[in-house]
Amino acid sequence: MEAQNIFLYLLIVFLSLHFVFTTLKGRLSPANTRRLIRLLHIPIKSPVAAAIFARKDTREFLDSSIKLVNEEDDFGFSFDFKPYMISKAETINRALDEAIPLIEPLNIHKAMRYAILAGGKRVRPILCLAACELVGGEERLAIQAACAVEMIHTMSLIKDDLPCMDNDDLRRGKPTTHKVFGESVAILSGGALLALAFEHLTEADVSSKKMVRAVKELAKSIGTKGLVAGQAKDLSSEGLEQNDVGLEDLEYIHVHKTGSLLEASAVIGAVIGGGTEKEIEKVRNFARCIGLLFQVVDDILDETKSSEELGKTAGKDKVAGKLTYPKVIGVEKSKEFVEKLKRDAREHLQGFDSDKVKPLIALTNFIANRNH
């Protein structure tokens, strides 16, 4: 009976809001129309569907990803990271769900939602929120920025999986976006996520000075000084023999293709949180370390894990002849490099509040110890 009452209540609310929307639609500005559409979206999607998604898919995904971070590491550090990460991921998932309603063009929005709500560790948006709080800011100030970097990241995955790029059929254990919706819709949905990311970022409640800097950081991270440069170098290096390349080539690819957006995520969080120039620079150097760390671990996993364990096609880098750390220096030396990057990352966090720094240290351990 209680469930029926809840259903009737939601139905009444929805019909009432729908009447208001259809009555006022022609009289509203585009910005207010968009807000009203999102309001109509909330009763059906956010409290029910998004909450169920956040508790089920995200928890299951993180349960299988988080290992060792709740125990003491080699430095004697201990932090209960799992509830922290799940809480942040749920906040981000709800915000993403509200940001991308099921409206026309329906097939594009379905593809956008399929790609971005398909699970995932949410490392970049969590890094953005943690960096904001590290320098004394509030989570609410950085939530739009956190969503923006995840939209950009998802766009990059859609493009990366296309037949003309890495030609992958699996992502997060599910068929890739172009396999479900077709290449043309996948490309359009990626472009839509890119545009929406900047639109969403500009809705953050911060000063124009901080906003301009945040937009610049994000744009730089995905252009020819960031992600695009790394992807171009990655593609041009396919099939080269080990003697034809060096560590500097490999580091260039990883720092730009993977590290640039991780760096931007942290820096934008610190900027929005009101960090000093010295604090922002320390956060930037920390993020550069974990950006490279993330990709080195990715290279190791691609070499040592199965497709079932990874949730994506295993061994594809080796088959494609891509440059990876195991290919250039071997698996064991790659693991040693992981430990060095962990130490370097921690050093850049010295001088910050000991409690506020804990999530970032735990995130570093999570990235290093993840199994997919």
From Swiss-Prot:
Name of this protein: Geranylgeranyl pyrophosphate synthase 4
Subcellular location: Endoplasmic reticulum
Species: Arabidopsis thaliana
Entry GO CC: endoplasmic reticulum
Pathway entry: Isoprenoid biosynthesis; farnesyl diphosphate biosynthesis; farnesyl diphosphate from geranyl diphosphate and isopentenyl diphosphate: step 1/1; Isoprenoid biosynthesis; geranyl diphosphate biosynthesis; geranyl diphosphate from dimethylallyl diphosphate and isopentenyl diphosphate: step 1/1; Isoprenoid biosynthesis; geranylgeranyl diphosphate biosynthesis; geranylgeranyl diphosphate from farnesyl diphosphate and isopentenyl diphosphate: step 1/1
Note describing how the cofactor binds: Binds 2 Mg(2+) ions per subunit.
Subunit structure: Monomer.
Enzyme class: transferase
PROSITE patterns: POLYPRENYL_SYNTHASE_1, POLYPRENYL_SYNTHASE_2
This enzyme's EC code(s): 2.5.1.-, 2.5.1.10, 2.5.1.1, 2.5.1.29
Tissue expression notes: Faintly expressed in flowers. Expressed in roots and siliques.
Family, per entry: Belongs to the FPP/GGPP synthase family.
Assigned keywords, A-Z: Carotenoid biosynthesis, Endoplasmic reticulum, Isoprene biosynthesis, Magnesium, Metal-binding, Signal, Transferase
Ligand binding (isopentenyl diphosphate): K121, R124, H153, R172
One annotated GO molecular function: metal ion binding
